[in-house]
Swiss-Prot record:
NCBIfam families: PRK03065.1. InterPro entries: Regulatory_HutP (IPR015111), Regulatory_HutP_bacillales (IPR023552), Regulatory_HutP_sf (IPR036482). Homohexamer. Keywords: Activator, Histidine metabolism, RNA-binding, Transcription, Transcription regulation. This is Hut operon positive regulatory protein. The keyword Amino-acid biosynthesis does not apply. Antiterminator that binds to cis-acting regulatory sequences on the mRNA in the presence of histidine, thereby suppressing transcription termination and activating the hut operon for histidine utilization. The lineage of its organism: Bacteria, Bacillati, Bacillota, Bacilli, Bacillales. It comes from the Bacteria. The keyword RNA-binding applies. GO terms for molecular function: mRNA binding. Belongs to the HutP family.
Length: 146
């Protein structure tokens, strides 16, 4: 079980999430890997999760009718949200809002085929009070096996 240096799934997700719309991260996505990117902003963490799950399904990053894929994605999203929110998933209840870019990457980061596929979710953007100018940058990463 050796992590391939060119197949660092978390790094790829972070670079995709950090890239501005007019930037193209210089990435060589391994053959057979899938990914999607998008934006989400809300005071509701459920809406943040739903937007990313919908993007992953509509871009065929995960299969819609396979529970374990949705479950793996959910845990990767929650892990990334913990990073952005410093372990406090609450947003609206404590008057916080987020504006995030996200990337979801699915692939095989290990050289052993038995290790299977993994999913990485990267979030980058701002979090703060729902007042323009009262936010700061935040970043989060979640990785889970499928």
């Amino acid at each position: 079980m050796l992590l391939q240096g060119t197949h660092r799934i978390g790094r790829m997700a972070m670079l995709l999430a950090l890239a501005d719309e007019n930037e193209s991260p210089v990435l060589s996505i391994p053959k057979g890997w899938k990914y999607c990117t998008g934006k989400v902003g809300s005071m509701n963490s459920q809406k943040v999760v739903a937007a990313m799950e919908t993007a992953a399904k509509s871009n065929q990053v995960i299969e819609t009718d396979v529970y374990r894929e949705t479950h793996a994605l959910y845990h990767a999203i929650m892990e990334a949200l913990y990073g952005v929110t410093r372990g406090q998933i609450q947003l609206a209840d404590v008057l916080r809002t987020v504006g995030l870019r996200f990337a979801i990457v699915r692939g095989r980061p290990y050289d052993g085929k038995k290790e299977g596929e993994w999913v990485a979710v990267a979030l980058y953007g701002t979090i703060g009070a729902p007042v323009k100018g009262s936010e700061h940058e935040a970043i989060g990463l979640g990785i889970n096996h499928i």
